[in-house]
């Protein structure tokens, strides 16, 4: 299914909704890319092929049963390895957290799952999102850097190892790797997307960002994530309705 990589995520999602494509086959296409390129690109901190295919089969069965589906139903999404999850490690790029999981998902992970997305795994990041860079290489030239700190999140898009990914930015960590890897990276305004459950570097500078092949793709992903969260006060301030004028 090599032609799948020429489609936008919106087109893929529509094909899944119309039963012209199933999530298992979609995920297998990305697994093939991972098998081809991961040994050179080194974008993944954690990837569980078996778990992904199990979740894909569940998504297909859900759709076949006639139940309603979300905007990202059956679409695999990669997460930067500072985004908390309870069912896979969140190591934050450091040996100090090797194998550690969280007691619950980050808010954005729950939003992704509610939209029908499948969590693929974790992508490599600079240590603690600001120290030593990871081993990830630029997919276009293995001798060059993919940029950081969301190195793996940009690299998986550029190498077609994932259709969508999530990163973070405190001082350029979305827009820089997006530029270096030739993909679309979107860092929304402060407070639009909850950081609850994500490694904090700076309360006033940390942002969640998204990566994809096209502006349409990142807009679709961002729309799912933009939501008020009472556990991230920055979103509460942004979404507070202004007082009516006298």
Language-model-derived ranges and their functions:
Residues 1-54:
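An N-terminal boundary/leader segment
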């Amino acid at each position: 299914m090599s032609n799948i990589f020429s489609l936008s995520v919106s087109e893929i999602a529509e094909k899944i909704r119309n039963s012209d494509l199933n999530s298992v086959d979609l995920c297998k296409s990305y697994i093939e890319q991972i098998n081809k390129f991961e040994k050179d690109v080194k974008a993944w901190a954690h990837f569980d092929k078996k778990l992904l295919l199990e979740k894909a089969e569940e998504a297909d069965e859900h759709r076949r049963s006639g139940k309603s589906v979300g905007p990202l139903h059956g679409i695999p999404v990669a997460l930067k390895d500072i985004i908390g999850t309870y069912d896979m490690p969140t190591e934050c790029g450091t040996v100090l957290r090797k194998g550690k999981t969280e007691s619950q998902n980050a808010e954005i992970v729950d939003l992704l799952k509610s939209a029908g997305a499948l969590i693929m795994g974790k992508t490599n990041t600079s240590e603690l999102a600001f120290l030593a860079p990871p081993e990830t290489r630029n997919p276009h030239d293995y001798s060059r850097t993919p940029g950081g700190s969301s190195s793996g999140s940009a690299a998986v898009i550029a190498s077609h190892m994932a259709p969508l990914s999530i990163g973070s930015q405190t001082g350029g960590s979305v827009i820089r790797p997006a530029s270096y890897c030739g993909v679309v990276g979107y860092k929304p305004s402060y407070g639009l997307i909850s950081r609850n459950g994500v490694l904090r570097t700076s309360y006033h500078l940390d942002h969640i960002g998204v990566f994809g092949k096209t502006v349409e793709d990142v807009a679709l992903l961002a729309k799912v994530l933009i939501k008020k969260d009472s556990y991230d006060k920055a979103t509460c301030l942004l979404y507070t309705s202004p007082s009516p004028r006298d």
